[in-house]
UniProtKB/Swiss-Prot annotation:
Organism: Streptococcus pneumoniae serotype 4 (strain ATCC BAA-334 / TIGR4)
Listed GO MF terms: ATP binding; glycerol kinase activity
Keyword terms, alphabetized: ATP-binding, Glycerol metabolism, Kinase, Nucleotide-binding, Phosphoprotein, Transferase
Protein's recorded name: Glycerol kinase
Quaternary structure and interacting proteins, as annotated: Homotetramer and homodimer (in equilibrium).
Binding site for ATP: 14-16, 268, 311, 315, 412
Record entry for activity regulation: Activated by phosphorylation and inhibited by fructose 1,6-bisphosphate (FBP).
Gene responsible for this protein: glpK
Record's GO cellular component terms: cytosol
Binding site for ADP: 14, 18, 268, 311, 412, 416
Length: 502
């Protein structure tokens, strides 16, 4: 094989780790994937073993090399993208985590989030971080670990512990402890970072009593953070030079560089992000304001709507209810359903995300009759994903006073043609599916490649763009609104059921 150069992207997700090697055309040369254990210590809690995540990353790096025959010295740079908010605290000396990683989905810190709300901090946190106070973000997770591991607070104050989201943990491991860094997009999801002033917020750190010594340095999304320790990369000292949280990486991978462009990634959850340009814009309707990416000395902001359960609702049909053998089968069943659409599934298994932010809500089903079939139930579950996306797109249009013309989509569930057509119908706009669904990994690769000159600039990246399939709306207006009205009723009833008893 010639000494062609490549970029490797490490995509560390919620249920698996992947390594993908890309060539100059942005094409996938090889990939490797490994699932790891989901730990559920109590109802609503979700944890990961951070060492197992690291082992899975080492495994997929090897797998990507083996599959392609590419050698480590042919990798020009590494880009990292990761499940956001998931929190690791580890011992600086030994490199060992002091507790499991608390995952973004986990609700174990919900009481702490409620406490902060009741103390009147909602507005302050929103103005500084762009976020809603919720157990979803890293801040309460860090506080929980420092509270529940004996001696942790004292050790943190002495500078013996380090905190990081998964990007930080992986860079620290790959560089053998030489770099303790994060990037704008991941820092913006901690609820500890002031996205206006671009620094860790001293006042919030004080409120939560989190020592500054444990925090990583915040850097741009495209620069060299460090090099791989040779023994972690088969003898290669390769620059790690691009980093972004998974949803922001997908925004970049979808080449959504212009303000007003919107993408949705249908993964475990579903995340809709709109590029709002260089002006920070706070949502008045419960969307998150976050950092899209920072590159070439400029920071681009974004509005985001987070849906906690999307693809994982299909996994639930497969693993929990055993209604389907595999995820793609859900499309076949949905097409076989009676065409009445009167069943509504509200998959609030871990609460409701944007724009409701109800952490007490739980999953519910409405409209069942004696005639309801398995096919109807599966279809309603798929439709629930599309309804939740509409909740957010409608809110975004109100917040920005922008009419969204097209939604760029990617992620595993975007392969479901039934879901994509229903999404176009219920939104009444075109859905443009990326030809290369690896947009998250591709975004990380683009960020890494730009900083080492593998790709010259954003204009060169735009030339690599190939659109996949376009789904156009075909449902009439009154039917569309009637269906959506039913969904709103179902969500309202779900929230009533979740009300805390006196």
């Amino acid at each position: 094989m010639s000494q062609e150069k490549y970029i490797m992207a490490i995509d560390q997700g919620t249920t698996s780790s992947r390594a993908i090697i890309f060539n100059k055309k942005g094409e996938k040369v090889s990939s490797s994937q490994k699932e790891f254990t989901q730990i559920f210590p109590q109802a609503g809690w979700v944890e990961h073993n951070a060492n197992e995540i690291w082992n899975s990353v080492q495994s997929v790096i090897a797998g990507a090399f083996i599959e392609s025959g590419v050698k480590p010295n042919q990798i020009e740079a590494i880009g990292i993208t990761n499940q956001r908010e998931t929190t690791v605290v580890w011992d600086k000396k030994t490199g060992l985590p002091i507790y499991n990683a608390i995952v973004w989905q986990s609700r174990q810190t919900a009481p702490l989030a409620e406490q902060l709300k009741s103390q009147g901090y909602v507005e302050k946190f929103h103005e500084k971080t762009g976020l809603i106070i919720d157990a979803y973000f890293s801040a309460t997770k860090v506080r929980w670990i420092l509270d529940h591991v004996e001696g942790a607070q004292e050790r943190a104050e002495k500078g013996e512990l380090l905190f990081g989201t998964i990007d930080t943990w992986l860079v620290w491991k790959l560089t053998d402890g030489a770099a303790h860094v994060t990037d704008y997009s991941n820092a913006a999801r901690t609820m500890l970072y002031n996205i206006k002033e671009l620094k860790w917020d001293d006042e919030i750190l004080e409120i939560l009593n989190i020592p500054k010594a444990i925090l990583p340095e915040v850097r741009s999304n495209s620069e060299i953070y460090g090099k791989t320790a040779p023994f972690h990369f088969y003898g290669g000292e390769v620059p790690i030079s691009g980093m972004a949280g998974d949803q922001q990486a997908a925004l970049f991978g979808q080449l959504a560089f212009e303000p007003g462009m919107v993408k949705n990634t249908y993964g475990t959850g579903s995340f809709i992000i709109m590029n709002t340009g260089e002006e920070m814009q706070l949502s008045e309707n419960n969307l998150l304001t976050t950092i899209g990416y920072g590159i070439n000395g400029k920071v681009y902001y974004a509005l985001e709507g987070s849906i906690f359960i999307a693809g994982s609702a299909i996994q639930w049909l497969r693993d929990g209810l055993r209604m389907v053998e595999n995820s793609p089968e859900s499309e076949k069943y949905a097409r076989d359903s009676h065409n009445n659409d009167e069943v509504y599934v509200v998959p609030a298994f871990t609460g409701l995300g944007a724009p409701y932010w109800n952490q007490n809500a739980r999953g519910s089903v409405f409209g069942l009759t004696r005639g309801t079939s398995k096919e109807d139930f599966i279809k309603a579950t798929l439709q629930s994903i599309a309804y939740q996306v509409r909740d957010i797109i409608d809110t975004m249009q109100v917040d920005t006073q922008t009419a969204i013309q097209v939604l760029k989509v990617d992620g595993g569930a975007a392969m479901n043609n039934f879901l994509m057509q229903f999404q176009a119908d219920i939104l009444g706009i075109d859905i443009a599916r990326a030809k290369n669904l690896e947009t998250t990994a591709l975004g990380a690769a683009f960020l890494a490649g730009l900083s080492v000159g593998y790709w010259k600039d954003l204009d060169e990246l735009k030339l690599l763009n190939e659109t996949g399939e376009l789904f156009e709306p075909s449902m009439n207006e009154s039917r569309k609104e009637q269906l959506y009205k039913g969904w709103k009723k179902a969500v309202k009833a779900t929230q009533v059921f979740a009300e805390v008893d006196d």
